Amino acid sequence: MLLIDLAGYELTQEEQELLEHPLVSGLILFTRNFHDKAQLQALIKSVRQRVKKPLLITVDQEGGRVQRFREGFTKLPAMQSFLQLDRLQLAQEAGWLMSAEMFALDIDLSFAPVLDLGHCSKAIGDRSFGEDVATMLPVAEAFIDGMREIGMAATGKHFPGHGHVIADSHLETPFDDRPKETIFNHDIQPFKQLIAKGKLSAIMPAHVIYTQCDSQPASGSSYWLKEILRKQLQFNGVIFSDDLGMKGAGFMGNYVERSEKALQAGCDLLLLCNEPDGVVQVLDNLKYQPTPTQKERYLSLMKRKQISWSELTASPRWQQAHQQLATLQDQWLEWKAQNA
């Protein structure tokens, strides 16, 4: 059950054939797929029309430095800004607006929000709402409530917490040597509490090895995904692997081995990006048949609400939220400059 990427602005015949493979469930879009809104809408329409099966179309449109579509879209401030600048009431509107803009493009899912604690990690930084569970959790929950209000599934990442490793898992495999008790009493709490409230439809584990807990990265660890996430926390939603093309996943072997280990560990859907040869290797060599439960889980993430861009941007709610978020973005950039 792979989610793969596209090379450019248009769907090629080869990419169409890959998307039609029975082991491919969807795709993830990047900035390289975006020239302008009209082109992006045409690309998505082409995918929907040419590939004759349900495809989950996804993106990372978190806000801040991780916002794949910018020109013509609302500038979403980094998640840290909502707590740092005491704009908690805007968090729900941000979740709603981000989701609404993606739905208006016929995108099913934005992988959000980040639930990692702390700002020291190179990979996370101001993508995190905050450092303390008690203060960040209401903000994260409000953002999720905004997503859920319009019908977008929330994906909590990066389980059980990526915020306290300096290394960037895009570039290397990070190791977290802190005691097990610290991770369970601190980092895992946002996930635990939001799962208990039924707020998370999906979870994305980290490519981090928690040395005092298990020898494998969480994304390839049955301890983290089956024992802790499924059994202990009673999570019954979708588990996405983080991008198996990242250097942090290299600990698990080649692309086929990474995919096998992630599936065996408990992942339902696998992201494999920026490695077209790796995608072909996996599709040619992976011996895997998704279960009916896994198919049901992934189909549950498909968007249910139809909304046009013109209707959305004409609504008073969007116009007000758009302006408020633009103001917060300016305030956040000013705050960062003053506190650099």
Curated annotation (Swiss-Prot):
Going by the UniProt record, its keywords in alphabetical order are: Cell cycle, Cell division, Cell shape, Cell wall biogenesis/degradation, Cytoplasm, Glycosidase, Hydrolase, Peptidoglycan synthesis
Question: Which EC number applies?
Answer: 3.2.1.52
Q: Where, by residue number, is the active site? A: H170 (proton donor/acceptor), D242 (nucleophile)
- For binding substrate, which residues are annotated in this chain's numbering? D60, R68, R127, K157, H158
Alphabetical list of Pfam families matching this protein: Glyco_hydro_3
Task: Cite the position(s) of the site with description Important for catalytic activity.
Answer: D168
Q: Which reaction does it catalyse?
A: Hydrolysis of terminal non-reducing N-acetyl-D-hexosamine residues in N-acetyl-beta-D-hexosaminides
Pathway, per record: Cell wall biogenesis; peptidoglycan recycling
PANTHER family associated with the record = BETA-HEXOSAMINIDASE, BETA-HEXOSAMINIDASE-RELATED
User: What's this protein's function?
Assistant: Plays a role in peptidoglycan recycling by cleaving the terminal beta-1,4-linked N-acetylglucosamine (GlcNAc) from peptide-linked peptidoglycan fragments, giving rise to free GlcNAc, anhydro-N-acetylmuramic acid and anhydro-N-acetylmuramic acid-linked peptides.
Q: Which HAMAP family match?
A: NagZ
What is the designated name of this protein?
Beta-hexosaminidase
Q: Which gene encodes it?
A: nagZ
